[in-house]
Amino acid sequence: IFYSDPQSESVENYMSFKYSIDQALKICPNPDLMISAGDTTQNGYKSTEWEACFDVMGDYYAKYPTATVAGNHEMKGDWNFVSFAQRFNMSGANTGYPQFDRTMGYFEYGDAIFVILNGEVTPADKKAEIMKKELQWCKSVLDASDKKWRIVMTHAGPYTSNHDPMDVRDYYINDSEYSLDAMGVDLFLNGHDHIYIRSTVKNDIKVNTGDGTTYLTGGTVGNKFYEYIPA
């Protein structure tokens, strides 16, 4: 089960998260894993929000293996993602930035490899350098795997349809050596937009499924929605 952006603050508001997952479980009653594109909280530094989330969803986290991404709201007031890292046991990365390495990781499942990146790194004047290290690490992981399907996850994607686009295109699309195209990524999962969109793209041109990377932006399992903004 793939979902994104619970982004709530209280037990009452997290009930939307629970109801959404309950509905998904009616369709897929025995999932092997759950994967989230992030923004679990509204304010990552507030322990009360994390406690509210786990009060409502703790049994689900305990029952179903879950991999989740660090979003921009996990970063709020917690630039090094301390609260996130204390609650989710990621396998880790090797970029030379330990405060961010602990928010990333990878795992293999069936005939697929999943790589989790963090595009919400700071400070802004170091972001290009940090993202280059992330993508170099990502490529090394993908190249070392013999799995057929390459899946990359992060919070904000390069193709967006809402009011708050993030500055990630230079890293995921425009870098000739470490772009998603160059790494042969089959599926890119992200959230952030609170709108469901999907397309298959190669070299910034829409193509048939299987001829490029399929970009899938999850909607939201929370109660905050945005209007779709056409490209």
Positions of PLM-derived features:
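Extracytoplasmic/periplasmic solute-binding protein
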Residues: F17-S20, E74, H155
